[in-house]
Structures are given as C-alpha cells and as structure tokens.
C-alpha cells in the first residue's frame, strides 16, 4: 500500500509503482480511543489515541500505525509532512470528550487550557521528530472548524471554533514554538469548504470570511499576519 501511495518509481514494464504523493498528513489524536465507548464515537475506527496521558506524562508508544506510515512515506521520498488535529486532548476540553456532543459552535477547549494546548502541540512536534525522525513542515491545529457539517452527531473527533478563538490559540502556539526553537509552520486552519474563506457557507460570520479575518490588518482582533511561524496560506477541502 505504501508503494501505491508514495512511490515515484516505475516497474519493470515502465509503469508507475504508485501515485507519488508529495505530502502526508498525520492526525494528532485527542484520546477518544482510550475512552472507548464512553467517547460517544460509535465506530472504533473513528477514534484516535493521544500521546498525552491523564497523569500529564507522554506515551510515545501511541499511534503506532500512523507513525509507521510516516516512516514508510519518508523512505519512499516524501519530504513534506503535516500534522493536524480534529480536537484538543480530552483532558483539556469543556465536555471531557473529543467530539462536540451537547455543545454549540465554539471551541471545545477550557479557558484555563489554552496555554497547555499550545505546549502539547510543541511537545508532539518535538517528540515525533525525536522518536521517529520525522520533522513536521506544517501544523494545522484546527481541522474544519467552520463546521458547516453537523457537529452535534459524534461521528468522529472534532470541534468547531470561531475566528477569535482560532486567533487566540494560534498566537499562543506561535509563541510556544518560538520559545522552543521550533520552525514548523502553523497553518491557520483547514477549511471544510472553500467558500468559508471569503464568505459564510452554512455557518455564521464568526466562522466565515477567514482570509479577511486572519490576514487583513484591519481585523485587529483576529489578525495573524505578523505572528511568527504563521505563513500567509489558507488551506481547504473541496470535497
């Protein structure tokens, strides 16, 4: 399977061995797998382990399957890696879950854990590089936070977030990376729909107009154009 995904070589008949993906995404899990059925995520396949444990220590034996694919990708020439999150660790969330069950459209992160969230991400970036030899070129702390899809049903790990919440967290993550001499670039988010970048699509203004919000200096509450490690990039999924 790794050859099919990553290889840029040809076989004896001159046919490509694979599709030669140039970047591989790694899902930094929030701990729903450890919660089991209590996670309220029905399918075990949709749950994810977390490096951070309840006692505050890190278990670098977690997420072995995904980490193995990072190594397989690197061995086959992939040189760009992106880490992303669907949810903060369950120890930091408002409802103690990695899903948005029973909540509204704001970030599922307790007020007192914003800095801990940033520290967790710095530790993951450093830990994976130390233990697996994989340097993440990019980190995306928020996956589809505009949340035009149904955040009520616990299908998988995930949380919405307003632009103000994203900006607040990104500034703290940026500061943590600078303090730890981490040069991984921080992507503002991965939008669930391109239209959320320049308008509102099945959501409200608090989670829309993302380009304007994050990269126009007039958007003083959410502007990230001067934050270290934050490139002027917007990422989205077209589906």
Regions found by a protein language model. Name each.
Residues 3, 11, 37-38, 55, ...:
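Acidic-enriched, low-complexity/disordered segments with a strong bias for Aspartate over Glutamate
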Residues 102-110, 144-161, 191-200:
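Active-site-proximal beta-alpha loop/turn segments in soluble metabolic enzymes
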Residues 126, 156-239:
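Noncatalytic carbohydrate-binding groove/subsite architecture in carbohydrate-active enzymes
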Residues 81, 85-88, 125-155, 188-192, ...:
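Active-site groove signature of glycoside hydrolases
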Residues 1-137, 156-167, 171, 175:
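N-terminal catalytic cores of secreted or lumenal carbohydrate-active enzymes
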